[in-house]
Amino acid sequence: MDEFHRCGKEDSFWQQCFLYPLFFQEDLYAISHDHYLDVSSSSRPMEHLSSNDQLSFLTVKRLIGQIRQQNHSIVLFVNCDPNPLADRKKSFYSESVLEALTLVLEVPFSIWSKYSVEGMNESKSFRSIHSIFPFLEDKFPHSNSILDARIPYSIHPEILVRTFRRWIRDAPSLHPLRSVLYEYRNSPDNLQRSIIVVPRVNTRFFLFLWNYYVCECESILFSRLKRSSHSRSLSHGSFPQRTHFHRKIKHIIIFSRRNSLKSIWSLKDPKIHYVRYGERPIIAIKGAHLLVKKCRYYLLIFRQFYFHLWSEPYRVCSHQLSKNCSSSLGYFLRVRMNPILVRTKMLDELFIADLITDEIDPIVPIVPIIGLLATEKFCDISGRPISKLSWTSLTDDDILDRFDQIWRNLFHYYSGSFDRDGLYRIKYILSLSCAKTLACKHKSTIRVVRKELGPELFKKSFSKEREFYSLRFSSKAAARSQRERIWHSDIPQINPLANSWQKIQDLKIENLFDQ
């Protein structure tokens, strides 16, 4: 495979035209067999992997023969073994086939994605988790509307094969892919009769399909947005020298192209900004309402004609930031005006100017958080704390540590919001639920538990936010951090609250359109 990568870098045409012979190499299936055992050994005991999951090169040769014959049942090729472990071995060899197929298809995709990213330097940022927070701080407040789009999961297998055909010229190499996709499509478990491409499936083959599918959508969509979004804006220009001011304004574009590092320069001001978190792209638009309608119409037509998908209107929602809030990352996102008083002294005169800037104001969704806590049996639907009965069998330290971890995750997750007053209501619910859980365990009351454990009960478990800042900042920075917003790049992995709350929001929107 390393040799194939090296040859592919030297001659991309050879790499695209001769993928099919790789399916006839026994080493490919040995590699996929080893990779499958490495993945499955973490979920199954080793004694189950010793005798039944051995690679048989005789079976591999039968598989290669069926590939040569272009048999459309290559996934179910182990059907001649009469022993009771046939179903399990069939699954084992099916996973090996999927691993081998993924290894072959990953080679052109990795090279193509590398060159496509090198050709579009602007598109590097929106594929990283670190692009979300600069987007929220810099692009979001200066936008008028937000398009909240959703990447469709269900897609016909032939559409996926055709998208691969655009980049892989070796048509026979796509026959195994077509066979696998149709085998999955026609399986009894698949009731929708389509390929469900989701990033949460813990299979290398489906993760590869998801990555390719998203990159294909973004490459086409980003190229279209790039053509129509960039424009020169005088509002972002800098004029240190005031001589011949009006003449410089007239020739701003000419000077900025030739001497961009001199006193007169202009910046690109894209009116359309794109970022993606998981499977939810967000498009921020700065312009008139007609531009928003055109972008929304383009997204619907793009899905309909390119992927042959009929998208419901609620799949692409538009929000005006001046009237509504947008929901993303578990926040309610809105824009507020921030007045700044500027005093300028020139000679003996003092000038005072009021500048109004727009900044993002993320709001902690208290009501949805209480609803999720009620689902997890920490409180009732009205927010009244109750005991966590399923934790009464644990030790006192384990109970305190679990409540402590929940609160630290919530406080850490919503540290990007200035207004954290609502979080203290969540803190009260968790602290009282912790006390009721301990009282239920010891068959006593909250007063007795607090008297026995002392006043350090709640201080031990719910005073970690001060330590959180003191460990990461100095004394001056810790005091300043209480007045500043702090984004943490690991918040999507800390708390599944954002995904679960977003699912609730999606169901509400779908039910609204179904009525």
UniProtKB/Swiss-Prot annotation:
Pfam families: Intron_maturas2 (PF01348), MatK_N (PF01824)
GO molecular function: RNA binding
GO cellular component, one term: chloroplast
Swiss-Prot/TrEMBL GO biological process terms: mRNA processing; RNA splicing; tRNA processing
Cellular compartments annotated: Plastid, Chloroplast
Keywords, sorted A to Z: Chloroplast, mRNA processing, Plastid, RNA-binding, tRNA processing
Family stated for the protein in its record: Belongs to the intron maturase 2 family. MatK subfamily.
Purpose: Usually encoded in the trnK tRNA gene intron. Probably assists in splicing its own and other chloroplast group II introns.
Protein name, UniProt field: Maturase K
Originating organism: Pinus attenuata
